[in-house]
C-alpha cells in the first residue's frame, strides 16, 4: 500500500513526527479536545474526526505550518526531558511534586494541564498559552513515569504506550494522528520513505491498546464489585452487633409490626439489620421454618443496612445563661443551657441528686390557653442568696448553691398578657422565659412596636390613686395602670347560661365597650364586680319573657339583695305591679309614672309630642316627627315605644335604624329613659354579629342558624329583645334575618336618608314586615318636593304612590291653594316645632356671613385653575356637567386653602416635625388670617368653638393651625367611628375640659351629636345643601345650651362660594313654603349645566381685571368694587364677635309676617360688617352694602370664557411648549445625589465658605452703616443662592461616607456642639457653634445638616436600627440622650436670657474696664486668648427681652437701662464711646472703700420641691453687709448658669475650669478666696460647682413641669410626633410614587385599577392612624379675660370709640404675641402685648392715668429692637424693694390697658402725620404689675 492509495498513513506519520506544536491557538485547543475524545474512542474514529476537520485548512494553512516548523525546531516531548523542551522554547522550568493530593486520579492530559498551567504561567508571565503545549506534554510523560514507578499506573493513557519492535524503521510511540493539515503538507513532500509493514505494525499497536483498555476496565469493575460486597458484609455485621448490644441493655428492638410485603400482621420474621419484618411465606413459599442465627432481609443483603447518622455529642454552654459567669454550673441534660443554682428563680436550696436534670427553660410548661395579646410589661427584681462567708472553707454543695460574692439583685421582665377566650379579669403576669420558649413570634412582634428598655406608661398609671373604699377589688393597681380600660372589666349583660347541676351555672358575659365576639364564659362563683346584679337581671328578664322559674340559688340571691336594700319580698312586689290597661287615646296631662320612676322629666312640648305619637298610633297613622334639631326627638320616640310596652298595647319587638355615629347616644338615652327595655345593639364586624344572633335574638335554642351568613329565623316565638338598635348599613347587609321578623314598630332616625326611593336602604326597608312607622328628621325637606313625596310614599304606599300625579297637582293650581293643600296633606302625618316656638328661655343664636379676601397665593391658584380648564369651561368645546363640577370643586379647594393641592403642599415650608410652618400657613389663606384673629379673641373671652368643614384634608391643615397657636382640640370625621367618637365628645363636654376647638366634618359631625358646651360655630366652607349646615350648627344650639350661640359662615368674596350661598337661599325658601305657612315659591331643582356655569363665572372678571389694573399703575382712576379690599382689623373683628342683641325688626305692618319666617330661615345670610382698604388715590367714601336677592335672568354669553381665558390659556401653553421638544429646554434644577456621589463638596464651595469666615455678621459701631451692610449682605446672599449647589444627601468621598457634605469628623464635631450648647439657634452659623471643623461649611449647607440632624432626632423607631428612614447611618446616636441634653440646655439658656437684661453680662462690672484696658494694651493674639469675647446675641434678642417680664422675690422687673444695654453689647464697642466709660470711672478710682454691689435679680420657681430655696434663704442671711461676692448664694448660681451658656456643657460635666478662668464670671472665684489655699484648687472648685449645677438643673426641670401644669400659656411642642411624622412621610411617598396610577386607571387599564384600589386603601389606613395620633397630641393654651373686662368698658363704648376717628392716635401694635425669650409666668399673670391695643382708646387711658404717665420717661425707639423704657435712678433703685400687693396693683386697669407712659403720649402726639410703623418694628413697652412670691 502506498501513500497515494491511503493518505491517512502520511497524515499519521506527520502527526507523530511533528506533533501539534506549531499549530495556532485555536487548532491546539481543538486538538486537545479531540485528544480527550480519542482516549475513549478507537483510532479509526479519531482518524475520521481528524479528516472531517482537515479540509478547512487548504494549501494556505499548510504553508504556514511548514514555515513555522522550519523556523523553530522543538524536541520530541516523548523522547526528551522537560529541561530540554523548556530550553528549546525559551521557558523557565517548574518542578512539581506528583505525590500531592491534587495529582491523584488524573487520567488525561487536559486535566493535568489545567492543574500545572497556573504555576507555569506564574513562572513565565506573559507567555502565550499555545507555546506551552510541548511543556504540558513532556510534564505529563514525566508524571506517567513517576506514577508507574510508584506502582500506580495511569488507567487512561493518552500517549506513551510502546509497541514491539520490528525490522522496519521504528515508529515513535504515538497515538493516532489528529490533524489533517499535516497530511496535506506530507502529500506535497513525497520523498519520505514508507512501507506497508509500518502501517500493519501501527494497526496492531492500536488493537493492542484497545484490548488493554477493555481488560483494565473489566478488572476495575470486578475489583469494585468485590469491594462493595465486603463493605456490605461489614455493614451487616456491624448492624447485627449494634442490635445485640441494644438487646443486652434491655432496649426493645425497633422493628415494624407488619409484613413488609403484604402489610399484614401475624407471626413475623424480624430482620437483624433493619426495622423490616416478613412472613416466612412472603419470603419463600417453600420455607417451612425460619432460619437459625442472624438473618438479614433481601433488602439489606442487596443494598446494605440503612445508614444511621450519629448525632453529635451534646455540649453544654460553658457559662451561666443568667449571669454569664463560669464555674459551679448545673448542666441541663435536655438542652445546651447551663445555670448556677443561685441564678434560678427561685434559687435551689440543694444540689439536684437525680441522674438527669432539666433547666427551668426545659421544665417550662406550655399554658393551657393561648395568649391573645401582650398588654404591658414591667421589671421584676430577683435577689441573690447570701454569698459564701469570706475566709471560710466552703463545701462543694455550698459553692454550688451560694454566689462567691455579694451580688446585686438582677432585673427580669414580666409580661401582662390577655388569654384567648378569657376575660380581662383573668389577665396575669408571665415570665419572659415562658414567652421565649412557647410564644416566640408573639414577643418578637411585640418588640417591633414597643420599647424594650422603658416599660409603657398609661393614663391610669400616672393619675392619683383611688381611695381604697372606692376600689375594693384594687382594680387600678391590678389592671387599670397596665393598659386595661375600666369598661372592659364591667359587665354589660349576661347573654346566656349553662347549668351543670341544680345550683351550678356558667354564664356567658358580654363586657362593656367590647364586641360580642369577646364575650367569655364565667363561673357563677367568680369574684367579679356587680356579677350578682347581672345574674339577677338576666333571670328576671327570662322570667318576664318566658315565665320561667328562677333557680333557687338565684332566688336566695335576689332575696338577699332586696333585704339589704330594705325592699319587700318579691311576691308583694308582683301584686303591686299588676296595672290596669290604659286607653291609648288617653292624653297625658303629666308624664306617666313609669317615666317618672326613671328620674327624668319631660319638657311640656316633649309630653305633647308623646301624646301626638300615641294619637297617631290609635288612628293607625304613620308619623313624621320633624322637630328642629336639639329638641329631643330621641327621647320622645323612646318614651313612646316604652309606653306601648308598659301599657300592654304592643310587646314589640321594635326596630330602630339610626346613623352609626349616633348609636351610642341612643343606647345611653334608652338606658336612662327605658330601664325595663332589653335593647340589643346589632352592629359590628361579622364575628360579633354571629355571636349576637346566636345568643341575643331568641330564647329558643337553634332558632337562628349558626354560621357567618345571616339566614332566616326558624321561629320568631320568644324573641329575647324588646328593641333592636341597628345602623343603615346593617339593615342592608343582614336583610335576610331582619326581614324575617315581624316588627311591631319602626323608628328611622335622620329619615331624610329615605328621600330617594331608588336607594338600597329605601328598597330593603320596604320589604320588612312593619306594623307602624315613625320617621325622625330635623330637616323634612332638603331639596325639592320630590323628596318629600318619597318620605310620604314610605309611610303610606296606598295613599302616595304616583309621583307624576303628585307633582302635577301642585304645579297646576295657584300658589295660595298649593300651599294650603300641601299643609292639609302634611298635617296628619307631621309634627314640627321650632326652638323659637317651644324654648322661650333658650339662648338665641345669631348667624352671619363673613366675607374674606383671597390671598395672593389663592388668587394665583384660582386663575391657574380656570386657565388650565379652559377647554372644559368653553361652551363651544361642549364641556360636560361633570367636568364643570370638577372645576367647581377645585375652586372650592382653592378658596379654603391652597395647601389642599398636592403641588402647593409639597412646596409649602414645613417645620422639623413635618407640620406646616405657621406664618406661611396663615398668610396663604384669607380665611386663616381672619380665623386666627377670631380664635385669639374667642379664647380670651372664654368661648369654645366648633369648626365645620366638608373636606377632611382641610381638617388636617386646621390641626396644624391649632398646634401652631397652642390650642387643644378634638376631632370627628367619617373615619372616627363608634366609641372613639363618643369618647371625644365626652372629653369635650366634660366639666373643666381644656379643649378649646372641636374640628368636625359637616356630614359626619352633623348628626345626633350634642356639643352644647360650645357657644361659637364657624362654618368654614358652606355645603351645597344648607340643611347639612343647619344640622351642623344645631350641635351647639340645642337643649342644654346656656349661652348665646354665634354662627359664622365664611364666604370668599367674588368666588364660587358667594354663588353657592345664593343657591342655599333658594333651598331655605323652599323649606319654609312647604313645611310652614308663609309665602309661595317655585320648586327647587337640581342645578343645570347653565346654572353651574353661572356659578363658575362669578367674580372671575374682577379677578382677571386686577392684573390689568396693576399694569396700568397706581395712577389709574378706575374705581369700583374690585379696587377695594376687605380688611378685618381689630375693630371689625370685635364688632363681628359682639354677642349683644342688635337685630332690628323690619318696619312696616305688611312686613311683620314676612319677617317672622325670614328671620328664621334666612338670618344666616346676614352679612357681617367689615372695613375696606381703598387703593391709593381714591377718596374715602362709604359704599352701601347691597345684597342681591334676585337678578333679571340674562342669556349667558357663549364667548365669555373665550374672551376671558383664551389669551391666558395660549400664553400658558406657549410656556409649556418651551419646556418640551427639541433644542435647548427650560430645565428644572434638581439635586440628585446619585449624579455627584464622588464630588468633593468641601472644595466646591470653598470660596463661599471663606467669605463666611471673613465676613460674618458683626454689629456696627453706629447705625449709619447698617443699611450698607444689609445691602451688601442681601446681594451676597442672592449671589450665593444662585451659585451654590447643595451636596447630596449621601456620598462616598475618599472612602468616607459624607452626609450632606459632612465627613465623619465634621459630623462628630457637630454632635459635640449639640451636646455642648444644645439645639442650634438661628444664628448658629455666626456664633460659637461654628467650631474649627465646621468653619468651611456655608450657612446653607450648615442649616440643611442641622435640619436633617433634628429631623433624625424626632424620627420614630428603635435606636437599634442601623439607619434612619432615609438611609442615613445612625452611627450609634442615642436619641434620648441627645434630646435630654438639648432640653436641659434650653432651660438653662432660657433662664439666663430671662434675667440677662437686669444683671448684664459681667458678674463684677467694677473690673470690666480694667480687664478691657489690659486687653487693649496687649497684642491682638494675646488679648484674644486671655479675654474671651462675650457671646454675641442674635439681632432679634433685644426685642424679645422686653417681653420677658418676671417678678422675682417681690421685685418688679424693669426694662434694661442704657448702661445695661451697653453691657449687652460686644466688649469692643464701649472702648470707643465716652458714654460707656463714664459710669465705670467712679468705681475704679475709689477702690479703697468697698464698692457698692450692683443690683441683682434671679429666681427659680421650683415650688419647694428641691432644697434650693432653703439653701438660698440660709445663704442670704450671711451674704449681707458687703459680702455679696464672698458668700455663695443665688447670685453665684445665676453666673454659673451664664457660664454654662457661654462655655457649654462638657463631655461629662460642665466646663467649670473654663468658666472659672473667664473674667466675666470672676464672682465665682470670690467665695473660695477666704476659705484657704486648700479649697482654691481648680478640682475642688469644679466639684463644688458640679454639685451645685446638678441641684440647679433639678430645680429648672421641676420649674418647667410646674409651668406647664399650672400656667400652660405657651405653645409647647408635642411630646411624641415621631409616629405622626413617619406616617406623613409614608403618605407623601405613597402618593408620589403612585401618582401615575390614577392616570392609567382612568385610561382603562384594569391592572392599574387594582393597584389604585390597594393604594387608596393604604392611604386611608395611614390617614386614620394620623388622625388618631393627632387627636392625642398635647397642646396648651391660655385663658384671658374678655375684652370688655380688660378695657373696663362696655361693648357700646368700645364701638363708639373705635368708630371715632382719632387724629392723634399712634399706630396699632402687633396683635401677635412676642416671639421670645421665654417668660416664666406666675399666678394670675397676664401677658402684655398679646391683646391688641386700640389706637382710639389712648386718650381715655392717658387721662385716667396721668400721674403714672408723668413719672415715666420717654422711650427711645431703636432699630429692629422694639421700644425700651429707660427708668431713672429712683425707679431703678425702687425696683429692688418688694412692692406691696394691693387692689390697685392687681386691678385689670393696671395690667391690661395700653402703655400709659409719657413716652406713649409724646409719640402719639408726634406720630399724627407720620407714616405708621410696621407691626414688626414695634413691641410692647409696659410691664405687668408684680406679685409677691
UniProtKB/Swiss-Prot annotation:
Top-rank taxon: Eukaryota
Record-listed ATP binding positions: 627-634
Comp. bias intervals (Acidic residues): 1-17, 25-39, 1177-1186, 1749-1773, 1819-1829
Domain Helicase ATP-binding, residue spans: 614-798
UniProt subcellular location: Nucleus
Disrupted gene: phenotype observed: Larval arrest, protruding vulva, sterile progeny.
Region (Disordered): 1-81, 147-198, 1168-1198, 1234-1289, 1415-1495, 1745-1829
Sequence ranges assigned to domain Chromo in this UniProt record: 401-458, 489-550
Function, as annotated: Part of a NuRD (Nucleosome Remodeling and Deacetylase) complex which is implicated in the synMuv B pathway that negatively regulates specification of vulval cell fate. This negative regulation is thought to be mediated via interaction with the promoter of lin-39, a key regulator in vulva development, and is dependent on the presence lin-1. Contributes to negative regulation of lag-2 which is expressed in the gut during larval development. Has a broad role in development.
Subunit text: Component of the MEC (MEP-1-containing complex) complex that contains let-418, mep-1 and hda-1. Component of a NURD complex that contains let-418, hda-1, lin-40 and lin-53. Interacts with lin-1. Interacts with pie-1. Interacts with akir-1.
Name this polypeptide is given: Protein let-418
Source organism (scientific name): Caenorhabditis elegans
Amino acid at each position: 500500500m502506498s501513500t497515494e492509495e491511503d493518505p491517512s498513513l502520511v497524515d499519521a506519520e506527520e502527526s507523530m513526527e511533528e506533533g501539534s506544536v506549531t499549530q495556532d491557538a485555536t487548532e491546539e485547543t481543538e486538538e486537545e479536545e479531540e485528544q480527550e475524545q480519542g482516549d475513549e474512542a478507537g483510532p479509526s474514529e479519531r482518524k475520521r474526526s481528524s479528516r472531517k476537520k482537515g479540509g478547512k485548512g487548504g494549501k494556505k494553512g499548510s504553508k504556514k505550518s511548514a514555515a513555522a516548523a522550519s523556523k523553530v525546531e522543538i524536541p520530541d516531548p516523548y523522547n526528551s526531558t522537560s529541561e530540554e523542551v523548556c530550553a528549546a522554547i525559551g521557558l523557565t522550568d517548574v518542578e512539581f511534586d506528583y505525590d500531592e493530593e491534587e495529582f491523584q486520579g488524573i487520567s488525561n492530559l487536559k486535566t493535568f494541564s489545567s492543574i500545572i498551567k497556573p504555576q507555569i504561567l506564574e513562572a513565565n508571565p506573559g507567555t502565550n498559552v499555545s507555546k506551552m503545549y510541548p511543556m504540558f506534554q513532556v510534564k505529563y510523560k514525566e508524571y506517567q513515569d513517576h506514577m508507574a514507578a510508584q506502582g500506580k499506573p495511569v488507567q487512561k493513557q493518552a500517549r506513551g504506550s510502546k509497541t514491539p519492535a520490528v525490522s522496519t524503521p521504528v515508529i515513535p510511540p504515538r497515538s493516532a494522528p489528529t490533524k489533517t493539515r499535516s497530511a496535506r503538507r506530507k502529500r506535497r513532500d513525497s520523498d519520505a520513505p514508507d512501507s506497508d509493514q509500518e502501517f500493519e505494525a501501527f494497526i496492531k499497536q492500536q488493537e493492542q491498546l484497545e484490548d488493554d483498555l477493555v481488560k483494565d476496565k473489566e478488572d476495575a469493575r470486578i475489583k469494585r464489585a468485590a469491594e462493595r460486597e465486603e463493605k456490605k458484609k461489614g455493614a451487616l455485621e456491624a448492624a447485627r452487633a449494634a442490635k445485640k448490644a441494644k438487646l443486652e441493655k434491655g432496649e426493645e428492638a425497633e422493628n415494624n409490626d407488619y409484613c413488609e410485603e403484604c402489610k399484614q400482621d401475624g407471626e413475623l420474621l424480624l430482620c437483624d439489620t433493619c426495622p423490616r419484618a416478613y412472613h416466612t411465606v412472603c419470603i419463600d413459599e417453600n420455607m417451612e421454618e425460619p432460619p437459625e442465627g442472624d438473618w438479614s432481609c433481601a433488602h439489606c443483603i442487596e443494598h446494605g443496612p440503612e445508614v444511621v447518622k450519629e448525632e453529635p455529642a451534646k455540649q453544654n454552654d460553658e457559662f451561666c445563661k443568667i449571669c454569664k459567669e463560669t464555674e459551679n454550673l448545673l448542666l441541663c441534660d435536655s438542652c445546651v443551657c447551663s445555670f448556677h443554682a443561685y441564678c434560678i428563680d427561685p434559687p435551689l436550696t440543694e444540689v439536684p441528686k437525680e441522674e438527669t436534670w432539666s433547666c427551668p427553660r426545659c421544665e417550662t410548661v406550655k399554658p393551657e390557653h393561648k395568649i391573645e395579646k401582650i398588654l404591658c410589661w414591667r421589671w421584676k427584681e430577683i435577689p441573690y442568696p447570701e454569698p459564701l462567708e469570706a475566709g471560710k472553707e466552703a463545701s462543694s454543695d455550698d459553692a454550688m448553691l451560694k454566689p462567691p460574692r455579694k451580688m446585686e439583685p438582677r432585673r427580669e421582665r414580666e409580661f401582662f398578657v390577655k388569654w384567648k377566650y378569657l376575660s380581662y379579669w383573668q389577665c396575669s403576669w408571665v415570665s419572659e422565659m415562658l414567652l421565649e420558649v412557647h410564644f416566640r413570634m408573639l414577643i418578637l412582634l411585640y418588640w417591633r412596636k414597643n420599647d424594650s428598655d422603658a416599660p409603657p406608661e398609661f393614663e391610669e398609671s400616672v393619675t392619683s390613686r383611688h381611695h381604697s373604699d372606692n376600689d375594693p377589688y384594687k382594680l387600678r393597681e391590678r389592671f387599670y395602670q397596665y393598659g386595661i380600660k375600666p369598661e372592659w372589666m364591667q359587665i354589660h349583660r349576661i347573654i346566656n347560661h349553662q347549668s351543670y347541676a341544680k345550683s351550678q351555672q356558667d354564664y356567658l358575659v358580654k363586657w362593656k365597650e367590647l364586641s360580642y365576639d369577646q364575650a367569655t364564659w364565667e363561673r357563677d362563683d367568680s369574684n367579679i364586680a356587680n356579677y350578682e346584679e347581672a345574674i339577677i337581671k338576666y333571670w328576671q328578664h327570662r322570667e318576664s319573657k318566658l315565665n320561667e322559674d328562677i333557680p333557687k340559688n338565684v332566688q336566695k340571691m335576689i332575696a338577699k339583695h332586696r333585704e339589704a336594700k330594705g325592699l319587700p319580698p318579691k311576691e308583694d312586689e308582683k301584686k303591686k305591679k299588676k296595672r290596669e290597661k290604659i286607653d291609648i287615646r288617653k292624653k297625658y296631662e303629666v308624664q306617666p309614672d313609669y317615666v317618672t320612676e326613671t328620674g327624668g322629666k319631660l319638657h311640656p312640648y316633649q309630653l305633647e309630642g308623646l301624646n301626638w305619637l300615641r294619637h297617631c298610633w290609635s288612628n293607625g297613622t304613620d308619623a313624621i316627627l320633624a322637630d328642629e334639631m336639639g329638641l329631643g326627638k330621641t327621647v320622645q320616640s323612646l318614651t313612646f315605644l316604652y309606653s306601648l310596652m308598659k301599657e300592654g298595647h304592643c310587646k314589640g319587638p321594635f326596630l330602630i335604624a339610626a346613623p352609626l355615629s349616633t348609636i351610642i347616644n341612643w343606647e345611653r338615652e334608652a338606658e336612662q329613659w327605658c330601664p325595663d327595655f332589653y335593647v340589643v345593639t346589632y352592629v359590628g364586624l361579622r364575628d360579633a354579629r354571629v355571636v349576637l344572633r346566636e345568643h341575643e335574638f331568641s330564647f329558643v335554642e337553634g332558632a337562628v342558624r349558626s354560621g357567618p351568613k345571616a339566614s332566616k329565623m326558624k321561629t320568631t316565638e320568644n324573641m329575647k329583645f324588646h328593641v333592636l338598635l341597628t345602623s343603615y348599613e346593617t339593615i342592608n347587609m343582614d336583610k335576610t334575618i331582619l326581614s324575617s321578623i315581624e316588627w311591631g314598630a319602626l323608628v328611622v332616625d335622620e329619615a331624610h336618608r329615605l328621600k330617594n326611593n331608588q336607594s338600597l336602604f329605601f328598597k330593603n326597608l320596604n320589604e320588612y314586615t312593619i306594623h307602624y312607622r315613625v320617621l325622625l328628621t330635623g330637616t323634612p325637606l332638603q331639596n325639592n318636593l320630590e323628596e318629600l313625596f318619597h318620605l310620604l310614599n314610605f309611610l303610606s304606599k296606598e295613599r302616595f304612590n304616583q309621583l307624576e300625579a303628585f307633582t302635577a297637582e301642585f304645579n297646576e293650581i295657584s300658589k295660595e291653594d298649593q300651599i294650603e293643600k300641601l299643609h292639609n296633606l302634611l298635617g296628619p302625618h307631621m309634627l314640627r316645632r321650632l326652638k323659637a316656638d317651644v324654648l322661650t328661655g333658650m339662648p338665641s343664636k345669631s348667624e352671619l356671613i363673613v366675607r374674606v379676601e383671597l390671598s395672593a397665593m389663592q388668587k394665583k391658584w384660582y386663575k391657574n385653575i380656570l386657565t388650565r380648564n379652559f377647554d372644559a369651561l368653553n361652551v363651544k368645546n361642549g364641556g360636560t356637567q361633570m367636568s364643570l363640577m370638577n372645576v367647581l370643586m377645585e375652586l372650592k379647594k382653592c378658596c379654603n386653602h391652597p395647601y389642599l393641592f398636592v403641588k402647593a403642599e409639597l412646596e409649602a415650608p414645613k417645620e422639623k416635625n413635618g407640620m406646616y410652618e405657621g406664618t406661611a400657613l396663615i398668610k396663604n389663606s384669607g380665611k386663616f388670617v381672619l380665623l386666627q384673629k377670631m380664635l385669639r379673641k374667642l379664647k380670651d373671652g372664654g368661648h369654645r368653638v366648633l369648626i365645620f368643614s366638608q373636606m377632611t384634608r382641610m381638617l388636617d391643615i386646621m390641626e396644624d393651625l391649632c398646634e401652631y397657636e397652642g390650642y387643644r382640640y378634638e376631632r370627628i370625621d367619617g373615619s372616627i367611628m363608634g366609641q372613639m367618637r363618643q369618647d371625644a365628645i365626652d372629653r369635650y363636654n366634660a366639666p373643666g375640659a381644656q379643649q378649646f376647638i372641636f374640628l368636625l366634618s359637616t356630614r359626619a359631625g352633623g348628626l345626633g351629636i350634642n356639643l352644647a358646651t360650645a357657644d361659637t360655630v364657624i362654618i368654614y366652607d358652606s355645603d351645597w345643601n344648607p340643611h347639612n349646615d343647619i344640622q351642623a350648627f344645631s350641635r351647639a344650639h340645642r337643649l342644654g345650651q346656656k349661652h348665646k350661640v354665634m354662627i359664622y359662615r365664611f364666604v370668599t368674596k367674588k368666588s364660587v362660594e358667594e354663588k353657592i350661598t345664593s343657591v342655599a337661599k333658594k333651598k331655605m325658601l323652599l323649606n319654609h313654603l312647604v313645611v310652614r305657612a308663609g309665602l309661595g315659591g317655585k320648586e327647587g331643582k337640581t342645578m343645570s349645566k347653565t346654572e353651574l356655569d353661572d356659578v363658575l363665572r362669578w367674580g372671575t372678571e374682577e379677578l382677571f381685571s386686577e392684573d390689568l389694573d396693576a399694569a396700568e399703575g397706581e395712577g389709574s382712576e378706575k374705581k369700583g368694587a374690585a379696587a377695594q379690599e376687605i380688611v378685618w382689623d381689630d375693630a371689625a373683628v370685635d364688632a363681628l364677635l359682639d354677642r349683644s342683641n342688635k337685630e332690628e325688626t323690619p318696619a312696616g305692618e305688611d312686613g311683620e309676617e314676612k319677617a317672622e319666617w325670614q328671620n328664621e330661615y334666612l338670618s344666616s345670610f346676614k352679612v357681617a360688617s367689615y372695613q375696606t382698604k381703598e387703593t391709593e388715590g381714591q377718596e374715602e367714601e362709604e359704599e352701601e352694602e347691597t345684597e342681591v336677592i334676585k337678578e333679571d335672568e340674562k342669556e349667558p354669553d357663549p364667548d365669555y370664557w373665550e374672551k376671558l381665558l383664551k389669551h391666558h390659556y395660549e400664553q400658558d401653553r406657549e410656556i409649556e411648549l418651551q419646556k418640551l421638544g427639541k433644542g435647548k429646554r427650560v430645565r428644572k434644577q434638581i439635586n440628585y445625589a446619585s449624579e455627584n456621589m464622588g464630588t468633593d463638596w468641601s472644595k466646591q464651595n470653598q470660596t463661599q465658605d471663606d467669605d463666611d469666615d471673613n465676613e460674618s455678621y458683626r454689629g456696627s459701631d453706629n447705625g449709619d452703616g447698617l443699611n450698607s451692610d444689609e445691602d451688601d449682605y442681601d446681594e451676597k446672599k442672592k449671589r450665593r443662592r444662585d451659585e451654590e449647589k447643595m451636596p447630596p444627601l449621601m456620598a462616598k468621598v475618599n472612602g468616607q461616607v459624607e452626609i450632606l457634605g459632612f465627613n465623619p469628623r465634621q459630623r462628630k464635631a457637630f454632635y459635640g456642639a449639640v451636646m455642648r450648647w444644645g439645639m442650634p439657634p438661628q444664628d448658629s452659623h455666626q456664633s460659637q457653634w461654628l467650631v474649627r471643623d465646621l468653619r468651611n461649611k456655608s450657612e446653607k449647607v450648615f442649616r440643611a445638616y442641622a435640619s436633617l440632624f433634628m429631623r433624625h432626632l424626632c424620627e420614630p423607631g428603635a435606636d437599634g436600627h442601623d439607619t434612619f428612614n432615609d438611609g442615613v447611618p445612625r452611627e450609634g446616636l442615642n436619641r434620648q440622650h441627645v434630646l435630654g441634653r438639648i432640653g436641659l440646655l434650653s432651660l438653662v439658656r432660657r433662664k439666663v436670657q430671662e434675667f440677662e437684661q437686669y444683671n448684664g453680662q459681667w458678674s463684677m462690672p467694677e473690673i470690666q474696664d480694667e480687664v478691657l484696658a489690659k486687653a487693649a494694651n496687649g497684642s491682638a493674639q494675646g488679648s484674644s486668648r486671655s479675654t474671651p469675647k462675650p457671646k454675641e446675641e442674635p439681632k432679634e434678642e433685644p426685642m424679645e427681652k422686653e417681653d420677658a417680664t418676671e417678678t422675682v422675690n417681690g421685685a418688679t422687673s424693669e426694662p434694661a437701662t442704657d448702661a445695661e444695654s451697653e453691657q449687652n453689647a460686644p466688649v469692643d464697642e464701649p472702648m470707643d464711646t465716652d458714654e460707656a466709660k463714664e459710669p465705670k470711672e467712679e468705681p475704679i478710682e475709689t477702690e479703697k472703700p468697698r464698692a457698692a454691689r450692683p443690683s441683682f435679680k434671679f429666681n427659680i420657681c421650683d415650688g419647694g420641691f428641691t432644697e434650693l430655696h432653703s439653701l438660698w434663704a440660709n445663704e442670704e442671711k450671711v451674704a449681707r453687709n458687703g459680702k455679696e461676692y464672698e458668700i455663695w448664694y443665688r447670685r453665684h448660681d445665676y453666673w454659673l448658669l451664664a457660664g454654662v451658656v457661654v462655655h457649654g456643657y462638657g463631655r461629662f460635666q460642665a466646663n467649670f475650669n473654663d468658666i472659672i478662668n473667664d473674667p466675666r464670671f470672676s464672682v465665682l472665684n470670690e467665695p473660695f478666696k477666704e476659705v484657704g489655699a486648700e479649697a482654691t484648687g481648680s478640682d475642688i472648685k469644679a466639684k463644688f460647682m458640679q454639685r451645685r449645677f446638678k441641684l440647679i438643673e433639678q430645680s429648672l426641670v421641676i420649674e418647667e413641669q410646674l409651668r406647664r401644669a399650672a400656667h400652660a400659656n405657651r405653645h409647647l411642642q408635642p411630646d411624641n410626633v415621631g409616629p405622626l411624622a413617619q406616617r406623613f412621610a409614608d403618605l407623601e411617598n405613597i402618593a408620589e410614587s403612585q401618582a401615575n396610577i390614577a392616570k392609567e386607571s382612568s385610561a382603562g387599564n384594569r391592572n392599574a385599577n387594582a393597584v389604585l384600589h390597594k393604594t387608596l386603601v393604604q392611604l386611608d389606613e395611614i390617614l386614620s392612624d394620623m388622625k388618631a395620633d393627632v387627636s392625642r397630641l398635647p397642646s396648651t393654651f391660655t385663658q384671658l379675660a374678655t375684652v370688655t373686662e380688660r378695657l373696663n368698658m362696655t361693648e357700646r363704648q368700645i364701638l363708639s370709640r373705635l368708630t371715632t376717628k382719632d387724629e392723634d392716635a399712634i399706630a396699632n401694635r402687633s396683635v401677635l404675641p412676642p416671639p421670645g425669650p421665654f417668660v416664666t409666668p406666675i399666678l394670675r399673670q397676664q401677658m402684655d402685648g398679646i391683646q391688641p391695643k386700640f389706637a382710639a382708646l389712648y386718650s381715655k387711658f392717658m387721662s385716667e392715668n396721668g400721674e403714672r404717665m408723668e413719672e415715666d420717661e420717654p422711650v427711645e425707639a431703636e432699630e429692629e429692637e422694639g421700644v425700651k423704657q429707660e427708668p431713672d435712678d429712683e425707679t431703678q433703685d425702687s425696683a429692688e424693694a418688694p412692692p406691696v400687693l394691693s387692689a390697685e396693683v392687681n386691678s385689670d386697669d393696671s395690667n391690661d390697658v395700653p402703655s400709659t407712659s409719657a413716652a406713649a403720649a409724646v409719640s402719639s402726639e408726634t406720630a399724627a402725620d407720620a407714616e405708621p410703623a410696621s407691626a414688626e418694628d414695634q413691641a410692647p413697652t409696659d410691664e405687668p404689675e408684680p406679685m409677691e412670691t
